[in-house]
Amino acid sequence: MFLALGLVLAAAGDEQGVVPERGQLLLHPVPDARFAFAGPVGARIAANLDQWLLCAPRANPGMLEMFRLRDRQPAPQLVPWAGEFAGKYLVSAVLALRQIDHTGLRSHLSNFVAQLLTTQAEDGYLGPFPRSDRLLKHWDLWGHYHLMLGLLTWHQHTGDSAALNTCRRMADLICRTYLDGPRRVYDAGSHEMNMAIIHSLGWLYRLTGEPKYLRLMREIEKDWERAGDYLRTGLAGVEFYATPRPRWESLHDLQGLVELWRITGQAQYRQAFQHHWRSILRWDRHPSGGFSTGEQAVGSPYASGPIETCCTVAWLALSVDMLRLTGEALAADELELATLNAALGAQHPSGRWWTYNTPMNGVREASAHSIVFQARAGTPELNCCAVNGPRALGLLSDWAVMTDGRGLVINWLGPGQFSLRLPDGTPVQLRSDTAYPLSGHIRWTIQLPRGPAQFPIRFRIPGWSAPARVRLNQGEERIGSPGRYLEWLRLWHSGDTVELELELALRIRAGDREASGQVCLYRGPILLAYDQRHNSFDEPDLPALDLSRLAEAKVSFPTNPGPEADLLAPWLLVAMPAQGGRSVRLCDFASAGVAGTRYRSWLPALHLPPPPPIQRLPPDGAVVGPGKTTFRWTTRTNASLSSYRLLIWPLTEDAGPVVQLNNLTQPWVSLDECAKRSLQPGQWYRWQVIAQGPYGQVASVEPALRFRYDPTARSVVEEQTWELGRGAVIVEAPLRGDPKPVWGTLQRATGYTNAPGPDGAPASAVQLDGPEQMLVYALTGELGRDYSVGVWVRLLATPEGRLGQVFSAWAGPMDDPLRITIQDRRLFARLESGQAYSTAGVPVKVGRWYHVAAVKAGTNLTLYVDGQACQSIPVPEWVLTRSEACALGGNPRYPGNEFLAVQLARFTLAARAWSAEEVRERASAFAPEPGTGSSSRSR
């Protein structure tokens, strides 16, 4: 059906170094393998070779020339990461050489590497910056990291000792700069970027055994604690988006955890890495398989910010490591999803360019346009994504077919021919005849040039599929479980065939938050999208899909086979019934927008199932002890949900759940001792939530969280009030002389006294003196779209030269869902979500009582003083926050001085937007207390 490629040369396996690996990987690349990928992916690989890899250095000669000009005048004005371009290009090109044994590419790369090596300074420096700046600033260590990766990959593929020696000289200079002296890698700044050098240092240490490389890795590990803190947060179960450095570059630091595991065998590194990978998958992997929103993790797969190509490539590299580390089929599922959708969606089918941003909805723009600020004379097409995107295709040779040390592990289900060797050196020829992912029928034929051989082959059964039939030689049949490998151990003969039948039924993922009322639609692993090019109506007129008629959708395959195939044609079209008897034609995401037309993959729909819950507590890997343990998951904004079910299974068994709680109406439940009687001490368990609604049910996002039951341990999850009070109250505290709430949880009170309130009654308010005193409450309800806060305030003094917080829920830089601030004797309502938003200031006086409220209602934030609206400002409809606490009189997490000398009374925080009338009522009298009624629940 598609253009097939000829013979290709492929990956060497794991290169054997001089350092024995104490931490073992479960899967490895097949040594000396040859791959020939066919089908649509093979066509994209060929286009990438012809239109980019062979011509990029000639069209952008500054890729190498910048290294020669580093000490010339005038000093080149480069972007801080310019040193990465040659390294990223080299990694991508060598990986492509593994796939296409192209004489021209091999000769081209030999010359490229030879020229690159001549630009290394006598002291070992290999970067584009002047002598005064070497390794000390910019992203210079980051550039050296990518150059080392490229040269080590070239050395692994060719055995070029000069490339390895160049890496050693680079590493030696880095060690001279940052070992045994006052300087630390931390001092270079741009921490998540420059500290990624730990990854390439680990590879180089395993190859050479040079002790100082490991010593520097250990020093970087210490510096992590002041930067990304990847090890400690991973062990503590902190979600990746809530770590100090959630930018995408940190994923390459996480690869350093795998190197530390391989070198030391200490389980903490493996545990931390796995936690972060799982956390990213649950909270920040978009339905296209792409990672990041605005170049970092934000804790929502529904956010609409840019999905950068470099971020997705880093996610692919991280997922290859996860697959090798754990052998879990889930990691291979993720690699397939991201490759077929986000990665191929980022590449134009012509092979001429890659995007910077491949959004779920929007247009495809060449990175050379979107981030043109990176271009310079001599490098008109170079930017981070242009040189990095091709790596997504090259990585296929790392995971398509692997070995577990016994036999073969087949992850790639598409067409192609593969020349492989078993661990004992036995040659195996494998041919895959299929139109997958367009067809669910896959047929493998095995050839054994040396005669019959006994070994296992493991076939991946995708997690999205139904139980699948696997048939040997059109006879013996087995059933493969979704999300697992089916292993077949036998004496194989030349001509043996194995056939896999996958059901490519349409499936749905409902959206939440920003994507509420919308769905993503898949056919097998392929994400579908509306494209102007295939419909006579434009995006504003896009009708809602009628999901009750999903079975009536019609699939067609318009692409013509052969060498004259139209590369701009979609792989498939799906005519989907829509509202009002209309029909919407959907194409594969990889082809959507390739002609410059607008596209959408979050699609409006009728009769939606609930969105999949995302588990929150207990954190992954927790120890659950005696007493009550709260299980919590994301709240919903989708009206199609009616109830939840909680299921708990033993981690290593296929038996049914040992705990099942039905008809739950809140996104949390407390498991008491009675329910825990089914749990065995020391046993590991996984738990899952099923959201149920009138139009179907859906399981929580994979991977499921895990916990170990230990009746002798103290549970890591403190019991809190997760339920909202009347009026969606999160916290309500009268503050009559003490901070105890009538609803919610007081986490800590760092000093206070009682004081007269607005009516003059004694002990009807609390007083904070300013230097260190504040009241901190648990933020157990989600602040997302609509919420309000109100409190009576009397300033005792105004902060001079700084701000003071009446109320703040600050969680980190540019992450505060709401704050009421005093600055320069003025009162402000503010919000930080990626950027700062602030009302104008309202003058306030010391010694006077004010009722202050801030209300966020969708896209508006309004500041009220004494019941009157002072100003409304536009803000994001949905706020993405990591906040888990709020404070009165200070900032709950900021170590600096934002304290306020103030008297406070009647504090309320609610997870809904108050009306103007409700605010006036709260401000009108200091008499019956609003919102409390006769009920109360607090800690």
PLM features per residue range, with description:
Residues 13-85, 103-127:
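Low-complexity, Ser/Thr/Pro/Gly-enriched N-terminal "stalk/linker" regions
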Residues 71, 75-81, 96-230:
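Extended ligand-binding groove/face enriched in aromatic
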Residues 79-98, 139-155, 190-206, 245-262, ...:
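Well-ordered alpha-helical segments within folded domains of soluble proteins
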Residues 273, 333-341, 346-448, 481, ...:
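C-terminal beta-rich recognition modules with glycine/proline-rich loops and embedded aromatic residues
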Residues 636-652:
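Solvent-exposed loop/turn segments flanking beta-strands in beta-repeat/beta-sandwich domains
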Residues 679-695:
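Beta-strand-rich modules
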Residues 692-712:
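Extracellular fibronectin type III
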Residues 713-939:
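Extracellular glycan-associated modules
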